[in-house]
Regions:
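A short, active-site helix/loop in glycosyltransferases that binds the activated sugar's phosphate group
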Residues: 146-187
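Aromatic "clamp/platform" in nucleotide-sugar-dependent glycosyltransferases that forms part
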Residues: 272, 291
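Short His-centered aromatic/hydrophobic patch
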Residues: 86-92, 109-112
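Conserved acidic donor-binding segment of nucleotide-sugar-dependent glycosyltransferases
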Residues: 323-338, 346-352
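N-terminal strand-loop element at the rim of the active site
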Residues: 5-13, 19, 25-64, 173, ...
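Conserved donor-binding/catalytic core segment of Leloir-type glycosyltransferases
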Residues: 4-6, 202-222, 228-231
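Short hydrophobic beta-strand element within catalytic cores of glycosyltransferases
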Residues: 308-312
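A charged, aromatic-enriched C-terminal amphipathic alpha-helix characteristic of glycosyltransferases
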Residues: 352, 356-386
């Protein structure tokens, strides 16, 4: 069987890492050839191991929508693709491509159901002219969230109708999405497949007093500004602790200035790092203060390294990873910054036995999402689609 995944950049982030894990497993199973169609390819990041697991082909940018769609269809025919996995959203005319080529189409949603409602509001505030339009007109239209939600439902329904399978990141999402779209979950083609998490060979339980954020500095979704305000609340009560932020992105300048304005102490901006494992190895706590998350890999990576995850329970995916609350991590009511600060103080005050128990349970929780288990779910989906 030949399967192709459509990405923007490759290999560049969490979704791309998941594709690589799936490809490695299916390569080992045998009978599969995996392709990646990507707009931007980072050749220096394509190790021999990755190249052995899959074949990467370049496609035009989304800015050239018609050219991109035609090239994808040409590659489907050329490579004899049986299943096309569209990461995050459908490509234009996917229904036509399905009819003309006989290829099965999958949409793999890597956010929470109807995640577009957050992006819609954010994009209407990007750029000088859009910000003016936002203040004069759109701010009132989108004030209560109902318009963004309606648009998100319309886009998701279009993606759902034009694919053979729509995957989400946990079973709670499957039920939530079916209800939102008015579809019976028992007859839908929505499938729940979690993100995989690799094993860590040598877990370090001798942690430093470090609270770690690791991710893209994109404040509309990650809301790192909340974490800085929370640190301002607890920094003097935790004099032997530090806050470390790993990553970069458009909000970095604003966040650095905010750290100065709040007079934050023992805070470090580490920038983009190719080796984030060294930070997880040392961190006692991994903190997430996001507005929205699908299945945050930073939390599952934290568990794999024996870190204690703390996050707002903004979505079912976050709750699934950290539950049971207080045993595999800590779930804070969204978006209560005072409660989050209290939770950090609570974690810092854990005795050695309590701390060890939580870290051990977190590591055990990760075993549910080993690449072999998750990739087997993908294999089952692909086999099911070809039988239809």
């Amino acid at each position: 069987m030949r399967v192709a995944f459509v990405h923007g950049r490759f290999p560049a982030g969490g979704a791309e890492r998941i594709t690589i894990d799936i490809a490695r497993y299916l390569k080992g199973v045998g009978g599969y050839e995996i392709y990646v169609y990507a707009t931007r390819i980072y050749e220096n990041l394509l190790s021999d191991d990755i190249r052995n697991a899959l074949t990467v082909r370049k496609i035009p940018s989304q800015a050239f929508s018609n050219r991109r769609t035609k090239e994808i269809e040409r590659l489907i025919v050329q490579d004899g693709i049986n299943v096309l996995v569209q990461v995050t959203k459908s490509i234009p005319d996917i229904d036509g491509i399905r009819r003309r080529t006989g290829c099965k189409a999958v949409v793999a949603c890597h956010g929470e159901p109807l995640w577009q409602r957050h992006a819609i509001v954010h994009r209407r505030q990007k750029g000088f002219l859009r910000r003016i339009a936002w203040q004069l007109y759109n701010k009132r239209r989108f004030a209560d969230g109902s318009l963004a939600l309606q648009k998100a439902k319309e886009r998701t329904m279009a993606d759902y109708l034009n694919c053979d399978a729509y995957t989400v990141l946990c079973d709670s999402y499957r039920l939530e999405l079916a209800e939102s779209l008015g579809i019976h979950p028992g007859t839908s083609h929505i499938y729940a497949i979690e993100n995989p998490e690799r094993a860590v060979a040598d877990i370090c339980f001798d942690k430093e007093n470090m609270i770690l954020f690791c991710g893209r500095f994109e404040n509309w979704s990650k809301r790192i500004d909340r974490l800085l305000r929370i640190w301002a609340k607890v920094q003097y009560e935790l004099p032997d602790w530090k806050l470390v932020l790993v990553g970069n992105g458009p909000a970095e300048k604003m966040l650095r200035q905010m750290a100065q304005d709040l007079k934050l102490e023992r805070i470090s901006f580490e920038g983009h790092q190719t080796d984030v494992a060294k930070y997880y190895r040392k961190a006692s706590v991994v903190a997430l203060t996001s507005q929205t998350e699908g299945w945050p890999l930073t939390l599952s990576e934290a568990q794999a390294h024996g870190c204690i995850g703390v996050a707002f329970g903004c979505t079912s995916g976050v709750k699934e990873i950290l539950s049971p609350d207080g045993e595999c991590g800590f779930i804070v009511p969204p978006y209560d910054e005072d409660a989050y600060a209290e939770t950090l103080l609570k974690v810092a005050a854990l005795d050695e036995e309590q701390e060890r128990m939580i870290r051990t349970k977190a590591v055990d929780k990760r075993l549910q999402y080993v690449p072999e288990v998750i990739a087997e779910k993908w294999r089952f989906l692909f086999e099911t689609l070809l039988k239809k």
